[in-house]
Amino acid sequence: MPGSTTITEQAVPTFHHGRHEHGQNFLTDPAVIATFVELVTATRGPIIEIGPGDGALTVPLARLGRPVTAIEIDARLVQRLRCRLPSHVEVVSGDFLTHRLPSHPHVVVGNLPFHQTTAILRPLLHSFAWSDAVLLTQWEVARRRAG
């Protein structure tokens, strides 16, 4: 079974809005980004990032030196990310909902698009290969899933 569930309540005051049809809200708060990366640092293994957007999390995660696969649905962002990131970061152009997760242990991370949170969590919660997940979601979704 995947790692234990921990919910941290923290206000996220600053977002930069992306494309509405993709539910994009880009995280820009440096304190939240630092806390997020700190949580990921406590994990082991390759990292799968859902919806890297403009790379606010991807860039500092790449500095950890671990393999990172960032799955981005917005083709206009994929090319920009590929130009900005080192070679150990693979940027995949596609929808996470149709992406095949690896069968080996990995860490799932992401600032989930609000309108897709439940659709993303369903397959994750039924996958047994991931060891840890660090996900930023709406408070209501986190409470409902954690019981």
Which sequence ranges carry the predicted segments?
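Catalytic cores of RNA-modifying enzymes
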Residues: 1-147
